[in-house]
């Protein structure tokens, strides 16, 4: 099969009446998903979309996202899912950087859409979905009798670009990683094997589908395997639990922030999720304490995976039924090579800290419109992740920090994640971000930005003393500042660049 579209067609022919996707009180069979995406693809071609054009999608986790996703691919377009909770200027930047030719959006995002549209330097075609019964709308708006064969099928090759996945921009402006249909097919196969996906599985999509991890591990893997996708439009942990149990969800892909919310809810009100057979945690590293507590409470095994937007978020992972080590992201999947190098590109020995490199067919084609950046991160087929980590004597990999986040203090390299892990052991601390800040002595000092648990008080001295009881002196924060909230990404990741920017303005 050359693309995910081939899998969609096979599953439509094999199980036309099987539920492909459901969201609250709406559902689509594989036959309906195929037909409706055909109709929308026809519309996109009629308004001028040509093969290779970039099409932006602006939706929450609703059925229209899934239809639009496959419609764009059928029309020969390149999918660009927009983070709709981003700042308008950030959205504008991404749309212009990728040279978007068309925007398909939810009608309830009309104000956001129009605010973005008026700022763009170039003209784009637009299609709005929503506001009516889905079947009536697609049957009426996008069909005029028989579909025109001229628009119905575009030849898709495996090396054609399928999607552009933008990085979070933690090191500067976001960059669009281009991936081929071949990349997505490979990774869908990888997930099928890793978690033994069958057509009987039901995936929960509570992570926003506009995030690359969700598109890859949830949407594409689900449709590839002919399973059912259960969409959750908004994160409300009580509703999440209800949706899981009402729909007998079997596979749950999440991030550590959601695991914490589930555990906090359990402490308030005991509940079970008996249908869930496996939880996959990705994007951000998860503490050993959370993993162990989750598995103990819910009797659901967790596997942790590691990757980046440039590698389709899978390079290594832990495995069910095999040894797992604390704080490790497991070992490389068989389709991928990983190694650790120093600043001179020399391969390091086990247990030595350096930059993580990844090589495999899951690697991106390159950054859109940024060939110089592509050359910078690719050397001899290896992708330089910018992540600092190590490999132990058993082949397990550990991700310690981002290269640019390492704090240089008095000749020592201090990894913020180590300090953060210690501070999260403090029962008063709810969340923490450790950053390097300039000091009067012209060296970097360590600052802990702390959010305390509700109705809890503490002092700078108390937090510093806690660190001194568990860490070498040079790793202890010199400064502590308390916050009610800190900027986060859509997946709950603390955005340290924005935290530093905020502090610089004070």
Could you describe each region identified by the protein language model?
Residues 331-335, 346-377, 414:
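Conserved ATP/PPi-binding loop(s) of AMP-dependent carboxylate-activating enzymes
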Residues 249-254, 263-324, 337:
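Gly/Ser/Thr-rich phosphate-binding loop
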């Amino acid at each position: 099969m050359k693309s995910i579209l081939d899998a969609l067609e096979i599953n439509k022919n094999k199980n036309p009446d099987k539920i492909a996707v459901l969201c609250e009180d709406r559902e689509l069979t594989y036959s309906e998903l195929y037909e409706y995406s055909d109709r929308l693809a026809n519309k996109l071609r009629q308004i001028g979309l040509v093969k290779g054009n970039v099409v932006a999608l602006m939706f929450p986790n609703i059925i229209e996202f899934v239809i639009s996703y496959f419609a764009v691919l059928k029309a020969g377009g390149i999918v660009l899912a927009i983070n709709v909770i981003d700042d308008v200027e950030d959205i504008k930047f991404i749309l212009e950087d990728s040279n978007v030719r068309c925007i398909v959006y939810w009608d309830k995002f009309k104000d956001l859409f129009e605010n973005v549209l008026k700022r763009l330097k170039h003209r784009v075609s637009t299609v709005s979905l929503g506001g009516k019964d889905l079947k009536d709308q697609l049957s009426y708006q996008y069909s005029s009798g028989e579909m025109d064969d001229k628009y119905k099928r575009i030849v898709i090759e495996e090396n054609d670009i399928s999607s552009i996945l933008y990085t979070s921009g933690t090191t500067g402006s976001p960059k669009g990683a281009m991936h081929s249909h071949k990349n997505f097919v490979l990774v869908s196969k990888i997930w099928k094997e890793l978690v033994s996906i069958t057509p009987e599985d039901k995936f929960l999509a509570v992570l926003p589908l506009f995030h690359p991890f969700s598109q890859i591990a949830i949407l594409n893997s689900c449709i590839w395997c002919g399973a059912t996708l259960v969409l959750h439009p908004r994160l409300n942990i009580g509703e999440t639990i209800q949706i899981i149990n009402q729909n007998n969800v079997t596979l749950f892909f999440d991030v550590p922030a959601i695991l914490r919310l589930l555990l906090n809810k359990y402490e308030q009100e005991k509940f079970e999720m008996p249908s869930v057979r496996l939880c996959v945690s990705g994007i951000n590293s998860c503490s050993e304490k959370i993993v162990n507590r989750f598995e103990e409470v819910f009797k659901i095994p967790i596997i942790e995976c590691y990757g980046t937007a440039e590698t389709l978020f899978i390079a290594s992972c832990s495995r069910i039924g095999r040894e797992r080590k604390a704080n490790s992201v497991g070992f490389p999947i068989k389709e991928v090579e990983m190694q650790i190098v120093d600043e001179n590109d020399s391969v390091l020995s086990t247990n030595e800290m350096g930059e993580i490199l990844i090589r495999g067919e899951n690697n991106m084609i390159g950054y859109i419109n940024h060939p110089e950046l592509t050359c910078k991160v690719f050397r001899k087929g290896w992708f330089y992740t910018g992540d600092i980590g190590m490999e132990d004597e058993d082949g397990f990999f550990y991700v310690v920090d981002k290269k640019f986040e390492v704090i240089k203090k008095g000749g020592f390299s201090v990894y913020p994640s180590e300090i953060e892990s210690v501070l999260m052991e403090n029962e008063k601390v709810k969340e923490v971000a450790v950053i390097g800040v300039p000091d009067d002595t012209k060296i970097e000092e360590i600052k802990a930005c702390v959010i305390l648990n509700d109705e809890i008080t503490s002092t700078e001295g108390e937090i510093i003393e806690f660190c001194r009881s568990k860490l070498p002196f040079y790793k202890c924060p010199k400064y502590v500042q308390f916050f009610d909230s800190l900027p986060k990404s859509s997946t709950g990741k603390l955005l340290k660049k924005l935290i530093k920017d905020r502090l610089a303005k004070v």
